[in-house]
């Protein structure tokens, strides 16, 4: 998929770029796999703001994605490659031999007409899903489970990939996209290949309004707020922070401050921490 750049016909068009959507084969999703998606505006069930910079944006419908890939032994044919407004990756509609339809994350190189299958006996081919125990060392994988049967949780964004480095007893050693190397139960499943839409990270939003279409609200610096709104606020003109280190809006140290728990349960599975 290529990136289309605009001519600078206006300030908003200058440097703006979009995907050319060459891989997309239809603009009409499968209705049976749609679910309503209500906007929360970053609020929780008490109505309090828990995630800043969210709100507005174009209406969306949720596409129900099969992250578990548990339909073993039944071949499925790729019917369409579709855009999904809820994630950076594209999705593929799979028509299974028994008549069921499911969406999966579209790996790089997956095309309409390709036949995929899940299960321990599946071939090592892009789009097939297998337990880590059945995948050869060195294979590039994505959509990795952390608990058997829970569904893929790791490596799902556009262009991401992980690599299977080795197997030790009941665990497989996997290097994630962040650079972190960790053990994962070898009974957990993963899908072969790299997530598609690789050039997503090269897209330049170009103007503020396009962020608003996506439901992203402005990010205001703390130094331009009042002192009752932010620890950095107040003062005349461009005043310094006035504290030993930068603070979050709630007065906690930030920008380099370690927030991971000292004795977290998953520490014993992590061989090498992610890159800074």
UniProtKB/Swiss-Prot annotation:
Keyword Signal appears in the UniProt entry: no
Chain ranges passing through the membrane: none
Compositional bias (Basic residues): 258-276
UniProt keyword terms in alphabetical order: Ribonucleoprotein, Ribosomal protein, RNA-binding, rRNA-binding
InterPro entries in the record: NA-bd_OB-fold, Rib_uL2_dom2, Ribosomal_uL2, Ribosomal_uL2_bac/org-type, Ribosomal_uL2_C, Ribosomal_uL2_CS, Ribosomal_uL2_dom3, Ribosomal_uL2_RNA-bd_dom
GO BP term (any one): cytoplasmic translation
Segment forming the signal sequence: none
UniProt KW Ribosomal protein keyword: yes
Chain residue ranges for the region called Disordered: 35-55, 222-276
One Gene Ontology CC term in the entry: large ribosomal subunit
Coiled-coil segments: none
Pfam families reported for this sequence: Ribosomal_L2, Ribosomal_L2_C
SMART domains, per the entry: Ribosomal_L2, Ribosomal_L2_C
Top-level taxonomic group: Bacteria
UniProt-recorded Gene Ontology molecular function terms: rRNA binding; structural constituent of ribosome; transferase activity
Functional summary from the UniProt entry: One of the primary rRNA binding proteins. Required for association of the 30S and 50S subunits to form the 70S ribosome, for tRNA binding and peptide bond formation. It has been suggested to have peptidyltransferase activity; this is somewhat controversial. Makes several contacts with the 16S rRNA in the 70S ribosome.
NCBIfam families hit by this protein: rplB_bact
Entries under HAMAP family matching the protein: Ribosomal_uL2_B
Assembly, per entry: Part of the 50S ribosomal subunit. Forms a bridge to the 30S subunit in the 70S ribosome.
Family: Belongs to the universal ribosomal protein uL2 family.
Official protein name in the record: Large ribosomal subunit protein uL2
Organism: Shouchella clausii (strain KSM-K16)
Source species taxonomy: Bacteria, Bacillati, Bacillota, Bacilli, Bacillales
């Amino acid at each position: 998929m290529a990136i289309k750049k605009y001519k600078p016909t206006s300030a908003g068009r200058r440097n703006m770029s979009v995907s050319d959507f060459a891989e997309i084969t239809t603009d009409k999703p499968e209705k049976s796999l749609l679910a309503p998606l209500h906007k929360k505006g970053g609020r929780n069930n008490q109505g309090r703001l828990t995630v800043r910079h969210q709100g507005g944006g174009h209406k969306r419908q949720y596409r129900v994605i099969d992250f578990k890939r548990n339909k073993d032994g039944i071949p499925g044919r790729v019917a369409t490659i579709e855009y999904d407004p809820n994630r950076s990756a594209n999705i593929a509609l799979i028509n299974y031999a028994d008549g069921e339809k499911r969406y999966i994350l579209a790996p790089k190189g997956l095309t309409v007409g390709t036949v995929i299958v899940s299960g321990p006996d599946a071939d090592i081919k892009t789009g097939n899903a297998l337990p880590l125990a059945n995948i050869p060392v060195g294979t590039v994988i994505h959509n990795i489970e952390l608990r058997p049967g829970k569904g893929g949780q790791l490596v799902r964004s556009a262009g991401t990939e992980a690599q299977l480095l080795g197997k030790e007893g009941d665990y497989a050693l996997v290097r994630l996209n962040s650079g972190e190397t960790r053990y994962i139960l070898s009974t957990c499943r993963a899908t072969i290949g790299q997530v598609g839409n690789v050039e997503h990270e090269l897209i330049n939003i170009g103007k503020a309004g396009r962020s608003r279409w996506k439901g992203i609200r402005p990010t205001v610096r703390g130094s331009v707020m009042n002192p009752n709104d932010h620890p950095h606020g107040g003062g005349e003109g461009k005043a310094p922070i006035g504290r030993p280190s930068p603070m979050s809006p709630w007065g906690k140290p930030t920008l380099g401050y370690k927030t991971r728990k000292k004795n977290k349960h998953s520490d014993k599975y992590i061989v090498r921490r992610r890159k800074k």
